[in-house]
Each structure stands twice: as C-alpha cells, then as structure tokens.
Amino acid sequence: MIQHFRFGAPLPTDSVVQDIPVSAGPVPFLAAEKGGWGYRMAPDAIVYGLGEMPRGINKRGWHYVTNNTDESRHSEDKLSYYGAHNFLLIDGGAGRECFGVFIDFPGKVRYDIGYTEYDTLRFSTEEPDYELYIITGGDLNAISRQFRQLIGRSYIPPKWAFGLAQSRFGYKTAEDVREVARQYKENDLPLDMICMDIDYMQDYADFT
C-alpha cells in the first residue's frame, strides 16, 4: 500500500507516474518534529537507500545531504555525491514492520540516520513544500516493487553508453578531442565515447 501526504505547495517534479490520492490521516511510523520527521529505530533496524551515497549499504550511523554535488574526492566522510535519490527502505528489525519512505522534493534533503542519536532517524527538507509517500506491505522486495511502480520504469541508456569512455580534465579545443579519437584508432584500442570534464562549464558552474 502507498500512502501519499502533501505539505505546503510543492513544485511539480514529474517524479511519480501513479495518481495516488492525498491522505488526510496521520503519517504512519514517523513523528513530526521541528522542520522534519523522526523515527525511533530498534537496535537491529537497518536502513537502505539514498542511491549513490558514501559508506556502506546500511546507512545507519551517518548523516547525508541529497544535493547533486560534483565531489572530486569520494571519501567516506562526504555528505553528498552526484545523485539525489530520496528513497529510504527501512527494515524495522525483529517483530517490526518494513516500510519505504519517498520524499518528492527538488531541493536539499538532510538525513541523520542514527548519527546524532543511534536509535533515531531524522530527515528534513530545506523548504516546507514537498510530497511524502509511505510504502508498506510485504517484505523489502515487495516494497521496492511498489516504489518502482510509483516512479515508473527507469530510463534505458543506449548501447554505446555501456562501452568504453575516455574522459579527462583539460581538453582545450575540439581538435584536442579529435586527436584523442585518432590516437585510439591508430593504436587499435576500443572507444565508444569521449567525455569532457567540468572545465567546459562556465566558471565550473553546474548546468552551464
């Protein structure tokens, strides 16, 4: 079962493909806190999710920010990487229900997953306008399937995207890129794509 809650006046993100009616009831599992939500975790609870983030598959014991950050040093002390996947899959532990949480919000979301207090998960959005989905029913796999149905099928990249990519910082001209392609061909090396690094952007700013 998927329950949908709306707070404020959220921006449409087109992240959800199913039309889930907005619930007027209380949000299950979570307790409202100043600026966000909290969940009391059992000692054996496990928290999965957040997509491309540092540290292990169990996110418990650390804090995160979904912020689409071009972080050059991928170390375990970082809070953000490239991706922003605001989905948590929570195994409540022995005798407790599993459930999923999806925050549909286009800005920063902060998570404290047992970092400040090991038995407490907290998350908050930088603005009060967002959609919240709580997913229940069955095991973790069943909850994941419901989430996939909620957001629709993933984009399937073209075949060449699974090939060999050459990327570096510092190509100055188009001729530099063509020369790389020529060198690969002359040396009989496979090459499916050439990527330019962040220096092609205006003042290294995203999306320029």
Task: Give residue ranges: language-model regions.
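Active-site and adjacent substrate-binding regions of carbohydrate-active enzymes
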Residues: 87, 169, 179, 197-203, ...
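Core alpha/beta catalytic barrel or barrel-like domain that forms the active/cofactor pocket
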Residues: 157-168, 189-203
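Generic preference for flexible, low-structure residues
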Residues: 115-119, 163, 180, 193, ...
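Catalytic and substrate-binding clefts that recognize carbohydrates or anionic sugar/phosphate headgroups
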Residues: 1-161, 168-170, 174, 181-186
